A protein has these predicted regions:
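Flexible, solvent-exposed loop/hinge segments and secondary-structure transition points
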Residues: 1-115, 119-146
Length: 149
């Protein structure tokens, strides 16, 4: 059985596995489309997908039934301000106490850092599934992209 600290450590290791020498807008498009395809093929709930890179919104898609992107924005802010996945922040809440009641942050899974040359330069966000499933979908897509390289 995994404790909170084991999950937290695993999320940090996971972040180091999926990084980029050079991320591009083209990769953002590939990531976003892949996420949409998986959700559709597996008949999952409708999701919103948002990818921010170097302060630019480079991809956003709200599937039919999604009307707001506020959770996506909150997850992106959580990632960009922490430098970690929003799931890591969720597991490590004691260090982010001031964010818990701040509605500009989202203390749950579904936001993932774009790490380029060791620096967090963006965020990949999915919202609409259970928060752990949002996180795992992002990791799955990043793993598939890594395996294809």
């Amino acid at each position: 059985m995994y404790g909170k600290k084991n999950i937290e450590g695993g999320k940090l290791m996971e972040e180091s596995l999926y990084s980029f020498e050079n991320f591009s807008h083209e990769q953002a498009l590939i990531l976003g489309v892949k996420a949409q395809q998986i959700v559709k093929e597996e008949n999952l709930k409708a999701v919103g997908i948002r990818i921010v890179y170097k302060d630019l919104l480079v991809f956003q898609y709200l599937m039919d039934g999604k009307k707001e992107d506020n959770w996506l924005k909150r997850k992106a802010k959580t990632v960009l301000d922490s430098g970690h996945s929003s799931y890591y922040v969720y597991c490590h809440q004691e260090d982010y106490q001031t964010w818990i009641d701040d509605e500009s942050y989202s203390i749950c899974g579904g936001g993932y850092p774009i790490i380029e040359n060791g620096q967090c330069v963006g965020a990949i966000c999915i919202s609409g599934l259970k928060h752990g499933d949002d996180h795992e979908l992002i990791v799955r897509i990043l793993k598939e992209m890594e395996d294809a390289r």
